[in-house]
């Protein structure tokens, strides 16, 4: 029961809460104030902060401002107090004319929350305008026959104020004939009429002067006057009459100027002059008389100025018809202006930003704007849009407000700015549209690392380059901007041949240009691997790297090195033997040389620069083989001197020379015998012949004795040096190790065949002594057709030296051994012409050099398996003549051992053309000359 009694109270409380919520919502939705016109600037209007329920400080922090449209700013906000004050002079008549009440609407924007509040301010009228007549003096003509009670409409006055301050009454100065009657129209205006109270007598008084006063109801009262001059005429007792008291017409606002819109007609019952009617527009304040024109004779109403629905929706025109004597009547024309779609929508940008970060989240607000169309109805209905391919969208708010927001993440590297075109379109037919442009810059963040144009780089630099020379330039591009795109360059520190990489090259951190800090030597360093780093200046910085390969190109900076003949260090000259029975093409010796360079710079050619007997010898262009060019004659000198030049093919070419001494004889005793037979023939009747012979023999004996002593000393020195070489493994002293594989082996191999010549006291006998080689077996001469024995020596000594030598020799390099299929044939079977073919490229050249030197090394240690014939090193006919060594052991067949019938043989003990056991089976026919 108690619950039932409390139910009505709960229902009342609920209704009260609902009413309060409704009032609060209405209050929150719109704020209304009232202020008088013409108050001072800065006058208080209302407390916005209080009415919004905010503190003034909070209101200032949220960024509050007034958003108005289409007219000057009349109000302002005081951010400290939160008060709304007047900003300019307010004239109600200018703003609202005769409209009452006069309401001004504007919006208040809280920028922090982008919240809009509507504010309505009523402008109350003050009595600041006095009534005014359209004409200051009015002339009336009245016939003397006019009966009392006749009414004459007068010009009415206009007061711009409204309410009590508007026109309230008319008054006429006291007189005997006229009175004033004021009638109220349907529109609320007051129209004065002059009433004839007593008949007129023109002869008594022809003109009457009256004063009409119009007063308002303000405090103080304001008034205006108009003077009326009444002339008394003869009888004209009928005034013109319009066909209808009020005319109504509707025309579109785009009606052209000069168009006739209406023709009014008034008739007068009088005749003659009294019936002649003319038409006039009543002069009144405003623009009506400036827009329309009424032709006085025809009554045609035409347009003389463009109409604008947005300025005035209708026009009320007062027209007059007056006859000849001056009687007139009035009518009204109401012109309604029809709206046409002649106004495009307008943009009012409320808030907009000019820049947005590229990492802004979708939904970021870019700007707030309003769209308004001055037309009405469907012509004022607006829609707003933007292109579909942009990462933005429009969100509509209240009162045609729109928010521009992002729809997805932005990327400055794709689009650094957006020229956003907003299009507002109305609902007219045809529709009108307006475009607004917003230039939005996308602020950069460091989201891109520098990128190189290639994944790796390679460059070539010639050796012996100057220090500080520019080697290469790398460039990385960063699509970011400003500091995020500023790229600096460096490289990863590394160690090259025990030295830091920074001691070889440097890099300009700004330009990416690499410089050489030292002069490179191809023979020591052939390439460098560098990791270049490109780093931007963002926060945090981003970087990328790229591989750079620097290849050192070979230059011709090393002259050829002559390996054979290697002359003794005491300055003596070796002697080569050429038998007089040698046929053209006989191999005398071979010049062996190498070049520390590579490629074309290491291609060698041999030339005969000088010869004591031109045309007797020739040198192979590519092989260096010295051969007889023709058969030896008896007139050819015993001693022939040859100068051979070895030249590479670099630019410019480098060369080296060697001087060879060739003794033309079958054996050394033959040389001595020939030298001994060179005695001057006896002349008859020469008395001093005996004396000359004695002196000559003595001189020759002394010279020969000195020569024998020198050769003996030389022999002892070479024997001692040979022992030293055997103790040191047969390596050459005083020569730098070559970078070519097997050069040291070639030197050891050639050292094996160094020989000495010594002469005994018997000038017709000689000894050719070979130092013990580093190994027991020697290469078998391909040109030799006889197999000779070693020099007589204790067998135990030879075996001991073999064991010592083999213990010092390195095992053969199996990498350079060729299979049977890879042995195209011996080069020893090729003729040593000068038309050899050069290798096609640097790879072939280096491979050839490596094979030559490795083959020479294997020949030195007695384990060569190149095959293809003795001394040919298994090379093909194409490359065989370049470095053949088969001629080296051939010289032993020309050696005669004094006091013995033995001759030199190969290591296997072969003599007299007999092949040893286990030989290669290649036998020469006896009795034939040695030929290649």
Swiss-Prot record:
Gene Ontology CC: one annotated term: plasma membrane
Signal sequence extent: 1-28
Domain Cadherin: from-to ranges: 29-133, 134-242, 243-347, 348-452, 453-562, 570-682
Topology in the lipid bilayer: Single-pass type I membrane protein
Sites where a glycan is attached: 419, 545, 685
SUPFAM superfamilies given in the database record: Cadherin-like
A Pfam family reported for this protein in Swiss-Prot or TrEMBL: Cadherin_C_2
Keyword line: Calcium, Cell adhesion, Cell membrane, Glycoprotein, Membrane, Repeat, Signal, Transmembrane, Transmembrane helix
One GO term of the biological process aspect: nervous system development
Protein name per UniProt: Protocadherin gamma-A2
Organism: Pan troglodytes (Chimpanzee)
Organism lineage string: Eukaryota, Metazoa, Chordata, Craniata, Vertebrata
Name of the gene encoding the protein in the UniProt record: PCDHGA2
